[in-house]
Amino acid sequence: MKLSELKTGGMGTVTRVAGDARFVSRVTSIGITEGCPIEVVQNAKKRPILVFERDSLIAISRKDCDLIDVEERR
């Protein structure tokens, strides 16, 4: 499932970061890597998605979230 599909309060584990080398480098530099836990703090329509990962609160565009695959945790 894509990160953009997780609902507010949803938690998951990153399974893949797709995209070109520049995007992958940018995302990994802020700590989003395969295997890291991630929580969606806010997922409002047509707005960037606010996520919490590794003690940081990060806003990510919907377009970028579509390139990040996660496995939902319950």
What function would you assign to each model-found segment?
Residues 9-12, 43-74:
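C-terminal structural segments of small proteins and small subunits
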Residues 34-40:
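Conserved beta-strand/loop element in small beta-rich adapter and peptidoglycan-binding domains
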Residues 5-18:
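Short, basic/aromatic beta-hairpin or loop at an interaction surface
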Residues 22-26, 36:
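Short alpha-helix capping/helix-loop boundary micro-motifs
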Residues 3, 27-31:
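Short, surface-exposed secondary-structure edge patches
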Residues 1, 20, 42-47:
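Short, charged beta-turn/beta-strand-edge "cap" motif at the junction between a beta-strand
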